[in-house]
A protein has these predicted regions:
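Non-catalytic peripheral regions of nucleotide-handling enzymes
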Residues: 1-87
Length: 87
């Protein structure tokens, strides 16, 4: 079995994302930009629902220029972020 690791960006990097039919098709962040060749998701995650600082997001794995990234849409902030790159 083969495995890959996610190297997280700390903090996550704000991204600009274009959608088609609610699916990311283009992204730009921190010098990376281009058409999304493949994507999987969204996976909905949330936490701390009992607190004012609750979080809720939709995560995607995407491929841009033969590199795999994890991105997410912060539902409460209405913003996209690049969370990390896969090795």
């Amino acid at each position: 079995m083969q495995s890959i690791a996610l190297r997280r960006f700390r903090p996550p990097l704000e991204a600009t994302v274009q959608l088609r039919n609610s699916t990311p098709i283009w992204i730009a962040f921190n010098g990376v930009h281009g058409t999304i060749a493949a994507s999987r998701g969204p996976w909905r995650t949330s936490g701390d629902w009992w607190r004012p600082t609750m979080w809720d997001r939709e995560e995607w794995d995407i491929e841009v220029r033969d590199v795999l990234y994890r991105i997410y849409f912060d539902v409460h902030m209405d913003r996209w972020y690049a969370e990390g790159v896969y090795d």
